[in-house]
């Protein structure tokens, strides 16, 4: 096993500079949409439960789509607030993202030395998907941090500590359990240590997500439901290519040409097959295989592969030079994405207009990803998707009949439905029918489709 030497002052200074760049990319835009949770709908599932944890709600979230580590990490940030604070939660998210950059540096140095550490840290710093999700109080960057740290411990030969880290990674998000494979690979011939590491992994998971085990039946139901939805597909991915190519595209969108240098590093690792190579290749292989049944091709699903590809891209001086040059492309993309986040979200204007003009007793129907579900009078329409039943409330006559007087729609659902109208004919008819109605309010911003572009409020009652 290759063990990295103690970092020099120059190397630590370089890491500090990289972390400063990473912080700048992540802090700018982290306040987008606040005080509403508009960056990612999963924040509505996670932050309120973290708030309840420190305000008398108990340790059992009663919801097991995800395990509990992120609730524990976010909980202290919610102390002192009378309601869930998405801004405070995002401060924690940014800190987790920066820790992920440092972990990539650690993994690279432990596996291949200084060049790999440098490229690993730079690559994760500029990777568009890592930058974006480091601003959101969701599980994916915490999972990636756990995976990267586990791999660093494995290539350093510290199997027992790697077991603890693997258990924490699985407690961040269930795919962390796949770390069992590289753990076994790293421990070939040292089976007693492997058994101890696996026991410590299980213990770390149980300690931090105990109610997943206590309520194993309910947890399995939630996990199975999430898996079925991911395997069925999702709104917006209907015209994607086959899954391997779709996730290759997501990787390119995150790393650009740096991903190609990473593939060269993979080829070198396949040829040389050192212990570090085998650890990283085994994780890359098992994680990639786990994505094959998935038809919901979210960019966040490739996040755990990003640090590994970046480290492999730096495993030698020539590769590292090419990788650092290639990193300029995702750096530019991330800066451009960050600039887009500085524009005002039109959903904030819609929420303010509703607060001023819609009577408090009027009930409101809203598409997902338009308004948060906090107001009691708001009724969330179901998200269309493959193998999902049509929501009968997507009919103006039905909305009127059930007493819903206002309707909020946005491009996040409507434009995707209309783009896939052959898959969602009834939903598409509903959105086309709205073209005959003058909206009571419309907020729009110019720009590309990386951010919400418009939201409309319709008066449903005659």
Residue ranges and their predicted role:
Residues 390, 394-462:
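Aromatic/acidic, Gly/Pro-rich catalytic loop(s) in extracytoplasmic/lumenal soluble domains
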Residues 88-111, 149:
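Transmembrane-helix motifs of polytopic, lipid-linked glycan transferases
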Residues 14-19, 104-126, 145, 159-161, ...:
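Transmembrane-helix signature of polytopic, membrane-embedded enzymes
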Residues 17-23, 260-264, 271-293, 307, ...:
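Transmembrane alpha-helix segments characteristic
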């Amino acid at each position: 096993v290759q063990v990295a030497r103690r970092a020099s002052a120059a190397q630590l200074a370089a890491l500090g500079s990289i972390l400063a760049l990473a912080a700048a990319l992540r802090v700018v835009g982290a306040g987008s949409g606040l005080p509403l949770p508009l960056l990612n709908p999963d924040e509505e599932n996670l932050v309120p439960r973290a708030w309840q944890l420190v305000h008398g709600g108990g340790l059992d979230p009663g919801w097991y789509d995800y395990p509990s580590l992120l609730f524990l990490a976010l909980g202290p940030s919610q102390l002192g607030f009378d309601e869930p604070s998405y801004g405070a939660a995002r401060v924690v998210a940014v800190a987790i993202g920066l820790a992920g950059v440092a972990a990539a540096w650690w993994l690279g140095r432990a596996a291949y030395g200084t060049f790999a550490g440098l490229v690993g840290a730079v690559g994760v710093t500029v990777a568009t998907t890592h930058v974006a999700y480091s601003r959101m109080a969701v599980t994916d960057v915490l999972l990636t941090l756990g995976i990267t740290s586990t791999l660093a411990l494995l290539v350093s030969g510290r199997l027992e500590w790697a077991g603890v880290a693997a258990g924490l990674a699985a407690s961040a998000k269930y795919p962390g359990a796949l770390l069992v494979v590289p753990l076994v690979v790293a421990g070939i011939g040292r089976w007693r240590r492997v058994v101890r590491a696996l026991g410590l992994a299980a213990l770390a998971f149980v300690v931090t997500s105990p109610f997943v085990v206590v309520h194993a039946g309910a947890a399995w139901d939630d996990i199975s439901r999430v898996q079925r939805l991911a395997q069925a597909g999702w709104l917006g991915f209907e015209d994607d290519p086959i899954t391997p190519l779709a996730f290759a595209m997501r990787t390119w969108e995150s790393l650009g040409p740096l991903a190609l240098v990473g593939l060269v590093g993979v080829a070198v690792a396949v040829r040389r097959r050192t212990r570090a190579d085998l650890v990283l290749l085994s994780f890359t292989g098992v994680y990639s295989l786990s994505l094959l049944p998935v038809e919901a091709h979210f960019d966040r699903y490739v996040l755990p592969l990003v640090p590994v590809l970046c480290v492999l891209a730096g495993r030698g001086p020539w590769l590292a030079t090419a990788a650092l040059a290639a990193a300029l492309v995702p750096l530019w993309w991330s800066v451009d994405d960050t600039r887009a986040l500085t524009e005002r979200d039109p959903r904030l204007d819609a929420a303010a207009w509703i607060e001023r003009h819609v009577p408090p007793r009027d009930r409101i129907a809203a598409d997902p990803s338009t308004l948060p579900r906090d107001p009691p009078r708001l009724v969330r329409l179901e998200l269309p998707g493959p193998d999902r039943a049509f929501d009968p409330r997507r009919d103006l006559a039905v909305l009127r009949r059930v007493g819903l007087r206002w309707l909020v729609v946005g491009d996040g659902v409507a434009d995707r439905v209309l783009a896939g109208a052959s898959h969602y004919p009834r939903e598409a008819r509903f959105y086309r029918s709205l073209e005959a109605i003058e909206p009571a309010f419309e907020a729009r911003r110019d720009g590309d489709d990386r951010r919400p572009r418009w939201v409309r409020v319709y008066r449903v009652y005659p």
